[in-house]
Curated annotation (Swiss-Prot):
NAD(+) binds at residues 31-35, 80-81, 120, 143, 180, 296, 320. It comes from the Bacteria. GO terms for cellular component: cytosol. Its EC number is 6.5.1.2. This is DNA ligase. Keywords: DNA damage, DNA repair, DNA replication, Ligase, Magnesium, Manganese, Metal-binding, NAD, Zinc. It comes from Pseudomonas entomophila (strain L48). Residues 701-784 form the BRCT domain. SUPFAM superfamilies: BRCT domain (SSF52113), DNA ligase/mRNA capping enzyme, catalytic domain (SSF56091), Nucleic acid-binding proteins (SSF50249), RuvA domain 2-like (SSF47781). The active site is at 122 (n6-amp-lysine intermediate).
Amino acid sequence: MNAESRIHALRAELDQHNYRYYVLDEPSVPDAEYDRLFNELKALEAEHPQLVTADSPTQRVGGAALAAFSQVRHEVPMLSLGNAFEEDDLRDFDRRVVEGLDLPGGDLFAAQAAVDYSCEPKLDGLAVSLLYRDGQLVQGATRGDGTTGEDISTNVRTVRNIPLKLQGEGWPAVLEVRGEVYMSKAGFDRLNAAQAEAGGKTFANPRNAAAGSLRQLDSKITASRPLEFCCYGVGQVSEPFGDSHIGILEKLKTWGLPISRELRHAAGIEECLAYYRDIGARRNDLPYEIDGVVFKVNSLASQRELGFRAREPRWAIAHKFPAMEELTEVLDVEFQVGRTGAVTPVARLKPVKVAGVMVSNATLHNMDEIARLGLRIGDTVIIRRAGDVIPQVMQVVLDRRPENARPVEVPTECPVCGSQVERTQLVKRSKGKETISEGAVYRCVGRLSCAAQLKQAIIHYVSRRAMDIDGLGEKSVEQLVDEGLIRSPADLYKLEFEQVVVLEGFAEVSSRKLLEAIEASKRPSLARFIYALGIPDVGEETAKVLARSLGSLARVQVALPQVLTYLPDIGLEVAHEIHNFFEDTHNREVIAQLLASGMQLQEEGELGAEFAASTTLAGMLAKLDIPSVGPTGAEKLVDKLGTLDKIIAADGIDLRQALNTKQAEGVREFFRDEANQLLARAIEAQLLDFGMHWSCEKRSAEGLPLAGQTWVLTGTLERMSRDVAKEQLERLGAKVAGSVSGKTHCVVAGPGAGSKLAKANELGVKVLDEEQFVAFMAEQGITL
C-alpha cells in the first residue's frame, strides 16, 4: 500500500472511531491504539504535505491567530425560545399549541388533545451554526443577535466531536446544523486545575469557559480546551428531510453528528412534565450543566402551521429549572434613576457566590416589592439568580433580623439631579373603562435635565439596534453630558470637531469618525427611529410593527390608543404608553428638533397591507366592547346597516333585524352614551384619514378573477402573514385549502415549504414563490 492509500485508510478508520466514540458512545479501540493510528497519520502527512486535506483528523489543532472575527448573516434566523418557569406556564403553552392547531380541547367541554412533543435537556453553553456543503464542514458561526453572528469556522474545527465531513450518504447538498458548544463538568474541572497550576485565570462556570474558549482569536487555545458539541436542530437545507424533529435528529446522528442521549418523545403535556421532573432529579448527576429542558412540537407540519411570534417560535419552549439560591446580608439599599425617570431600589449585599458567580447587588424592582418582602436594611435574605442570570431577593429570613434593622425610605429628591420624586399610580387597563390597581412607581420629574435620565436616553438612542452611532460608548456619552455638550438627543447633531477632539479617549481620527457616524445616522429606517426614541414598553419588535403597519411617523404620532390596539401584539396598556409619549409636549419638542437637524426617515409610505386588510368596520365595532356584541354580531350589524352613522342612529326595530334582543339592547345602551358615540366616530375618522376605507358591498364569487380555483399556501411568507394572503385570495374568488390535490390550481410556497410543495411537484401543480405571488396579485390590482 502506497502512502496516499494508507493516508486515506487511516483517515477513514479514525473517522469511524470518532463516530463510535463521540456519537454512539461505543469506543471500538483503546485510547492507546487510537493514538498510535493518529500519530501514524500525522507522520505520513508530515512526509507528504501535498496530501494534507482540510477534513483530516489531524487538522483540529488550530491555526494562526485572527485579528478579529468577521460577521456571518444567518439565512434562517437563529431565534430564541420563550421560557416557562412554572408548571402552569407549560400548561398554558400546551393550550396555545392545541388552539393554534385547532385540535380538540379548545373549548371547556372537549377533551384536551395530546400533542406529540420532543424533549431534550437545555445545555448551558453557546449556540452555534455549522454549515456543511456536499458533506464538508465549510463554516461555523455564533448565534449573535439571531440575524448576524461571528465567523468561528477555524475554532469549531478544533472541537473533537464535530465531524469535518459527514458520515454515510443521503445528506442534503447544503445542510446547516444548529446546536450547543459546551464544556462538561469534568472538562471544566480539569481546565480550571490546569489554569490555576499555570497561574492563569480560572473560570466561574462551564458556560463562561465554553463561550470564552470558543471565541478565542487564537484557535490553538480553543483546540486545547475540552469543548464538546450537541446538535438540536437544523437551519437552512437545500432539500427537506424527515417529517418530525426527532426524525431529523436521528438522521443527523447517522451522519456523524452528536445528539443528546436524553432525547425523548412525549405524548402530551403530562409526559413532558414527567420528563422535566426526571431530568431535574438527575440534574446534578448529568456530566454537563443544564438550566432546563426544551420541548418542541415534534411534527414539522405542525411547527409550520404554528409559525413564529416576534423573535421566538410558537412551537417550542424552554422549561427552566429553579435558580440556585444562597443566604446573604443586605448592607444597604440605594436608588438608581433609569431612562424613563423611574427611581428603583437596588440591594447592596454582602458578597456571596451563587451558581459560580460572586453576587454583591440584587434587583428589588420597586417599593411594592420591598413592601411585599417586608425588607429592611440589615436583614438576612435568600437570593437567587433568576434565570441563572439576574440576582434577585426572594425572601427575608425574619428569625435572623437584627435589632438595628431599619426600614427602606424612598428619597423625596432625585439622588442624581435633586429634582422632586413623584409617586405615580400604575394601572392595568382593561378593554372597557375599568382599571385595576397595579401598584406605584416613583419617578424623577427632571426629565432630560436629570443627568442620569439624559445619559441613559442617549446611550439607548445611539445603540446598535437604534441609531447605530459607532464610537459613542457609555463613557463617551457620560463625558458629553457632564461637559454640558448635549442636553437632548438632538444636540448630537450640533457637535463640532473642536468639542469632541479634546475629550478623553478621542484623537483627531476618532473624532472625525464619530462625527461621520453621527451624520450617517440621519437616514434611519422609520422602525429604528421609533425604537431610538425610547418609548416606554416599545422594544425593537413593537417599533417594527408600528412602522410596518402605520407607515409614517406622522400617523404613529397621532394614533389613538384604540387604533393602536388593532396592530399585532399591541395591547391597550402599551397603546396608552405610545399615545401618552407623543402627547407629551417635551417629547414633541425633542422629535421636532431631531427632524429639523436634517433627519430623513427611510421606508415611510402608505399603510401596511396587512393592517389595511385586517381592519374593517366590523372589527372596529367588535373592539369597542359593546355589551353582548362580539365579532359575529358586529359582522351582522355591518351587513345589515352598512355605516357607523346608521348603526348609531338605529332604533330597536332596525337593530333586531340583525341581532337578537339582548344584543340589540346592548348596542342601543352603548350608543346612548355620547362619549361612546364620540369615541367611535373619532376612531373611524382617524382610520379613514389614514387611508382606510369601508366597503359595504359584497361581491359574489361569480365573475371574480379566481372564481372556482383552489389555492394552497405553504412555508413561511416574509412580506405578509398567511392570513393576509388567504384573505386577499378569497377577495378574488379563490378557495384556500389546507392540502394539495389534483384539483389544486396553484400552490404559493415560501421558505420552509415541505410536503405540500413536494406533492405539488409530484402532481404537476403550478407553484409560485413569494415574489411571483406578489407580482401576480399586483396584476389583479392588489398590493401586498
